[in-house]
Amino acid sequence: MAWPCISRLCCLARRWNQLDRSDVAVPLTLHGYSDLDSEEPGTGGAASRRGQPPAGARDSGRDVPLTQYQRDFGLWTTPAGPKDPPPGRGPGAGGRRGKSSAQSSAPPAPGARGVYVLPIGDADAAAAVTTSYRQEFQAWTGVKPSRSTKTKPARVITTHTSGWDSSPGAGFQVPEVRKKFTPNPSAIFQASAPRILNV
């Protein structure tokens, strides 16, 4: 049999049906299985977690410095309400802002979810000058430099010593290219030139 049975579609379908679905269905917001124990079964997990800050947020009382990754890709939450239209493009003719300014000044609806906003541009230029990656960098010690894979150029031996001839006549010879071979210890015969062996 060329292929094992697991490669057949019927066996694959049977294998996927027998998988433990709890391994696949773990929500991405949980960082450990201890979070599952803290929730009470039967009550809404989303309702109990709504008052808590998101997982990426930090406590203001902590003195732990932010890493460069957290500075670059930190999560800022903004209330999800009606979006402000771009200026000059409000509803109606001529871009008047009669209704749109009233909508944008309204507070967001209670219970609105937070929207993750990525930073645009360089938020703090002072942090970009010296990053934590540069501060934590240590050069590796004890690492050998890699050998170069470049082949050494072959030596070109010319046999003619004539000066600059305008016409390469009978005195012109093609230069010989001799390559220096390294001895091969696994070779049977270490002959410098091909010889005829009497057997």
Curated annotation (Swiss-Prot):
Annotated lipid attachment (S-palmitoyl cysteine): 5, 10-11
Consequence of substituting residue 5 to G: Loss of Golgi colocalization and gain of microtubule colocalization
Function recorded in the entry: May have microtubule-stabilizing activity.
Taxonomy of the source species: Eukaryota, Metazoa, Chordata, Craniata, Vertebrata
Positions of the UniProt region annotated as Mn 2: 165-177
This protein's name: MAP6 domain-containing protein 1
Post-translational modification: Palmitoylated. Palmitoylation enhances association with microtubules.
Stretches for region Disordered: 33-110
Record's subcellular location: Golgi apparatus; Cytoplasm, Cytoskeleton
MF GO annotations: calmodulin binding; microtubule binding
A biological process from GO: regulation of microtubule cytoskeleton organization
Keyword match Disulfide bond: no
Stated family: Belongs to the STOP family.
Positions of modified residues (Phosphoserine): 38, 167
Entry-linked InterPro entries: MAP6
Annotated region (Mn 1), positions in chain: 130-143
Cellular component GO terms, alphabetical: cis-Golgi network; Golgi-associated vesicle; microtubule
Subunit and interaction comment: Interacts with calmodulin.
Keywords associated with the record: Calmodulin-binding, Cytoplasm, Cytoskeleton, Golgi apparatus, Lipoprotein, Palmitate, Phosphoprotein
